[in-house]
A protein has these predicted regions:
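Short helix-coil transition sites and intra-membrane helix breaks within transmembrane domains
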Residues: 58, 74-78, 109-113
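Extended intrinsically disordered, low-complexity coil regions enriched in Ser, Thr, Gly, Ala
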Residues: 78-96, 113-123
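Short, hydrophobic/aromatic alpha-helical segments in well-folded domains
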Residues: 83, 100-103
Length: 137
């Protein structure tokens, strides 16, 4: 049963990242970084977050990833870059991602939004993506 749950989580990660790789977009680096003190972290991330939460019905992957990006902006968490990459993979446009981040200014404040925009800009630059700023005028 646990192996089935783990495999379900791995399949969901691969679906979200369009990768057959064993470490798509660095998701597994999280567990690897802490295996000396929390050797079961990867299992929790894969089984709970991806086999459980991300696999729940009712919302498509774009909505789920945009919700995750929103939560990470609000918390000012560094994992936002990984999830921006995932958002692009599941079909979010750069403009949708930037629009979401900008919408959070009155709710999370300028510092968290500026931090998120910095990360988004880095991700877009790495991937050679240009944002259509006319969408915001």
């Amino acid at each position: 049963m646990a192996d089935d749950l783990y495999q379900k989580g791995i399949k969901k990660i691969q679906e979200l990242t369009a990768s057959a790789d064993d470490n798509p977009t660095g998701f597994m680096d999280i567990g690897e970084a802490f295996k000396d003190i929390a050797p079961d972290l990867t299992q929790y991330v894969v089984e709970f977050a991806f086999a459980g939460i991300y696999s729940r019905p009712g919302r498509d992957n774009k909505q789920k990833v945009l919700t995750t990006i929103t939560a990470l902006v609000a918390q000012g968490k560094p994992q936002i870059g990984m999830h921006i990459k995932t958002g692009l993979t599941v079909g979010l446009t750069p403009e949708e991602i930037i629009g979401c981040i900008m919408h959070l200014i009155p709710y999370t404040g300028f510092p968290s939004v500026l931090g998120a925009l910095t990360v988004a800009k880095e991700v877009f630059n790495e991937q050679g993506i240009t944002v259509d700023t006319s969408a915001f005028q």
